[in-house]
Amino acid sequence: IVYICSRAADSLNASIDARRQGFIHACQTAETSHDLHWKVLEVPRDGGYADSALASLLALDQFPDAICCQTDTIAIPLIVRLERYDKLTPRDYSIIGFDDSQYADIMNLTTMKQDPFLMGRKAAHKALTLINGETLGQPHEIMHARLTLRETDAPVQLVLRDNDRAINE
């Protein structure tokens, strides 16, 4: 499994870095009970991020079964570029993004999303409370995410090679 991310801009580092750290923590935890191989690939924040991700993926010794992208805006152009190399989702790999962008539905991308309206409302409430000189009852909150399953993910199949024929188990 590969996590593709960019270096966070100072204004975005909390959310993006938390996603990366969450991925790393989950993989490190899963390593103890599974034969899990994982990697974090960092791509530039400029317009060449999808090409950089593509080059990094194709350079790996083994193409990953699953790709998790920091945002849908990395995942969607990557899907299109991988199709040019006959890498199709979910046949060859699964891919997931974050944020449920406007094109995620069109591309049938599986994605994670938080409720931006609720986040904005809670942030405004906290700001107004502080402006009024009051103490926050709950300064930190966990915002739940919703997984939207579409068509870019599938269970991993073990493929054994026997005289050039694949046997799926």
Model-assigned labels for residue ranges:
Residues 1-169:
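Bacterial carbohydrate/catabolite-sensing allosteric modules
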